[in-house]
Amino acid sequence: MSHKIMAINAGSSSLKFQLLAMPQGEMICQGLIERIGMANARVTMKTSAQKWQETAPIADHRESVTLLLDKLLSHHIINTLQDIDGVGHRVAHGGEFFKDSARVTDETLAQIERLAELAPLHNPVNALGIHIFRQLLPSTPSVAVFDTAFHQTLDESAYIYPLPWRYYTELGIRRYGFHGTSHKYVSTALAERLGVPLSALRVICCHLGNGSSICAIKGGQSVNTSMGFTPQSGVMMGTRSGDIDPSILPWIAEREGKTPQQLNYLLNNESGLLGISGVSHDYRDVEQAADGGNRRAALALTLFAERIRATIGSYIMQMGGLDALIFTGGIGENSARARAAVCHNLHFLGLSIDEEKNLRNATFIQAENAVVKVAVINTNEELMIAQDVMRIALSDKVTFGVSA
């Protein structure tokens, strides 16, 4: 029996959605509502056969959800609201409380709101989206899918920071990790394509995009990840610095009089590829500038790859070897240059790539004699969310694979 499952990602001024037929994993309709709160909000929806786009005044998130449901009905994508069998919501932060996706109850929702202190920009609007869908679809089960949950298997030695102990016990400061839904999806997809249980593999997943994170997966579980207390830490990103000497911040504050908020903006919005290149946060623009002779752009590309390589090296040490390396995310899936730079001169690890396969974005791009598999796998967080809705909220408990 097929079920229609809605995957929702609510942002501060946007609502991204996908309606999927499950368990097949087929996209029925997907879209985005942008500029919520403005008179010229933009609504984009598409199916495999059609695409619709319009502007309309949308005052708030409730209006955006109401409009979305009305559009699904008016375009005959669904016949009634009861056709939607479940709703899955992406939630930024589950803290230590949520170690898996969870069916939404009043207590679940209250806990998500309490965790807003760890993700003040995201959890409140995620919770708002859940509230609205529960009100408009009161008989439809909903599931919260947490970006942090996959990393709750980290050992204490991997998540504790060397700060005074009370900062962990009293304030919850520790490594949480993010992109968990993506890391879980692509590692599961890799195991299926190899025909090997994920539990038997040592995998490093590189989710590379405007936000980037690396994850070490051993025995099917996350054992380390580069993002930490916030998504700012780890490798260099589009506009985020990643890891730097922390004493740089008070040094800058003293000399330039910057507030904590200004320092946070500097680290999150003015650094990374943009900060070094002076060109753009977009990897493609930086590539183009580097090819045109821009020295800082070329340096930015080198720094980007070297930070990733250093992280991969430390994770190989931790896991005692490597069976497969995965590239995913906007850069990981589309930039042959980035993949080649990360994998350069790693023959001593049994890791090398085939240039032709890499250039055509083949699923497996390792050289013929390479020991380590190197895969390019498009992430699909919406499908992972829909699968969790089926697993947790629907009584028939369908068993899934990941579509190849």
UniProtKB/Swiss-Prot annotation:
CDD domains: ASKHA_NBD_AcK_PK. The lineage of its organism: Bacteria, Pseudomonadati, Pseudomonadota, Gammaproteobacteria, Enterobacterales. GO terms for biological process: acetate metabolic process; propanediol catabolic process; propionate catabolic process. Works with phosphate acetyltransferase (pta) to capture exogenous propionate and regenerate propionyl-CoA during degradation of 1,2-propanediol (1,2-PD). This is Propionate kinase. Its EC number is 2.7.2.15. It comes from the Bacteria. PROSITE patterns: ACETATE_KINASE_1, ACETATE_KINASE_2. GO terms for cellular component: cytoplasm. The keyword Transferase applies. Its main location: cytoplasm. Pathway: Polyol metabolism; 1,2-propanediol degradation. Keywords: ATP-binding, Cytoplasm, Kinase, Nucleotide-binding, Transferase. It catalyses: propanoate + ATP = propanoyl phosphate + ADP. Gene3D superfamilies: 3.30.420.40. It is found in: Cytoplasm. Belongs to the acetokinase family. PduW subfamily. GO terms for molecular function: acetate kinase activity; ATP binding; propionate kinase activity. Signal peptide: none annotated. Pfam families: Acetate_kinase.
